[in-house]
Design a protein with these regions (language model features):
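Active-site-proximal helices and loops of the catalytic beta/alpha 8
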Residues: 23-38, 52-58, 62, 69-70, ...
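Active-site-proximal N-terminal segment of extracellular/periplasmic enzymes that hydrolyze or transfer
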Residues: 45, 56-60, 144
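Eukaryotic low-complexity intrinsically disordered regions
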Residues: 146-148
Length: 480
């Protein structure tokens, strides 16, 4: 208890002050599976902004920083830097333009150039943080005529860049042919099985690695075909994932240092997602668990909700977990109604767990439930909730408890969630909007415990934990 509390105080005080070719078969899903990793999604932060805040990121206990897409992208709204503008706004822009590639080279007008990317990676290395880059080989910009000539030339002409079915809109996302070859939301589908494209794209990925990237998040991963999926008329083999994870070379080129990378895919769960087959190549997102957790947070209790299950067929060791993602916040705003305090309670639950690799989505600076875009600027740092003392505390707790088993229980009314890690420590989370006294069984030995953040005392007697919890507050208790 003393060590944890002092580590947290040190972290908070610190915050306030301030190439080998692939061969054979590789498992690039997890460079480390110690159960101590955490990811900060520095959403729309520029490379310079991430570098400038790397000290604070490391002090807050994160082991990875995930950037937004780094490749050349569509220049919309005159190159404006608003996260999301309306016709009345003087500064225009849309955050999603960087999800519309025009070439696969490093640097874009929204986040920074190649030199800024390198400086960010150098800063991360200095502080022992690893850089994950959001990559998206599945599609190009809606305006496909904006694709740069260098990309067209690299793939043998514009007509060879896309699947034969690549301009037909998906109408059934559970139809694997449509899902993996068709146009999604107006975004034309790239022929990811074209060896010329694979070679060009892999050059981009290897360039990122040479500059210091140590992992990748594959956007729209379930829209890129698996070996068992139907072939597009222009394709002879669905081998993209073999190449992207270093199992196979293309035109003599292989993924660099595949055994040292962490790779996961955005594979949103549905009726025909093929999670177990994707798991042969990449880790994946536990989107259903996030939905269940948000429901408990919205309810203010987890009664009749099982938070111990992951709602996923893949071992939780290979899942990226979240309370919310940039999609749940920005697209249909399905998580935007949750307050920062509610999101933090969810974070403590997933970060205290033994498995999964939790990702903390950084909301925009100045945002609220009534103003989701906040100060509304691309490139700026998000709000400071990523380094809240309770967040720092559970990030440290996660590292200290690595290897310990977990048990998740709730009070009878479901308002207090306990994540126990063996008999060494617990995270106690009041997800309700009321302060109240409680009693519940625990794995902690009998004794009096002082919370590491707030200094509040709790008592364990004959295996029963008791005390008073404040509304939307978390506590961390550890045995001596």
């Amino acid at each position: 208890m003393y060590n944890l509390r002092n580590q947290i105080l040190l972290g908070v005080l610190t915050l306030c002050c301030a190439s080998t070719s692939a061969s054979g078969i590789h498992d690039s899903r997890h460079a480390s599976t110690s159960g101590s990793e955490t990811i900060l999604h520095a959403w729309t932060w520029s490379f310079d902004t991430i570098a400038a805040n790397m000290h604070d990121i490391a002090a807050a206990g994160y082991t990875y920083v995930q950037t937004s897409p780094a490749q050349a992208c569509y220049i919309g709204d005159g190159g404006g830097t608003a996260l999301y503008s309306t016709p009345e706004d003087s500064v225009k822009g849309k955050w999603y333009y960087y999800y519309q590639p025009t070439d696969w080279t490093i640097g874009n007008y929204m986040l920074g150039n190649r030199n800024s990317f390198k400086a960010m990676c150098d800063s991360a290395y200095k502080y022992g943080v690893r850089i994950l880059v959001d990559v998206l080989p599945n599609h190009t910009a809606i305006d496909h005529h904006a694709v740069l000539p260098t990309l067209d030339a690299a793939v043998g002409g514009h007509e060879n860049l896309y699947h034969a079915n690549g301009f037909n809109e998906i109408t059934d996302y559970n139809n694997r042919y449509q899902c993996t070859t068709g146009q999604m939301g107006g975004l034309p589908d790239v022929n990811t099985e074209n060896p010329d494209f694979q070679y060009y794209y892999l050059q981009y990925v290897n360039d990122l690695i040479n500059l210091g990237a140590r992992g990748f998040r594959y956007d729209t991963a379930k829209h890129i075909g698996l070996p068992s999926d139907p072939l597009d008329a222009k394709s002879t083999c669905n081998d993209f994932w073999d190449i992207a994870t270093g199992r196979k070379a293309v035109k003599g080129l292989s993924l660099l240092m595949p055994d040292s990378l962490y790779i996961y895919g955005e594979i949103l769960q549905d009726r025909n997602t093929k999670e177990t087959e994707y798991a042969e190549y990449v880790d994946q997102t536990a989107s259903s668990y996030g939905q269940v957790l948000r429901q408990a947070l919205a309810n203010g209790n987890a009664k009749d909700i099982d938070l111990s299950q992951w709602y996923h067929p893949v071992n939780a060791q290979h899942l990226v977990t979240w309370v919310e993602s940039h999609d749940t916040y920005c697209n249909e705003h399905i998580s935007a109604a949750l307050t920062n305090d509610q999101i933090r309670m969810g974070w403590v639950i997933i970060a205290a767990r033994a498995t999964g690799r939790p990702l903390f989505y950084s909301r925009p600076e100045g945002s609220s439930t009534t103003n989701i875009w906040g100060t509304n600027r691309i490139g700026a740092r998000g709000n400071d909730k990523f380094r809240h003392p309770e967040v720092v505390a559970v990030n440290i707790f996660r590292k200290d408890m690595a290897g310990q088993p977990e048990t998740i229980t709730t009070t009878d009314d479901g308002t207090v969630v306990q994540v126990a890690r063996g008999n060494r420590g617990i995270a106690l989370v009041n997800i309700s909007g009321k302060s109240h006294k409680f009693k519940m069984p625990t794995t902690l030995p009998d004794g009096t415990y002082t919370d590491a953040v707030h200094g509040k005392n709790f008592k364990v007697y004959k295996g029963i934990l008791s005390g008073k919890v404040d509304f939307l507050t978390s506590y961390l208790l550890t045995a001596e």
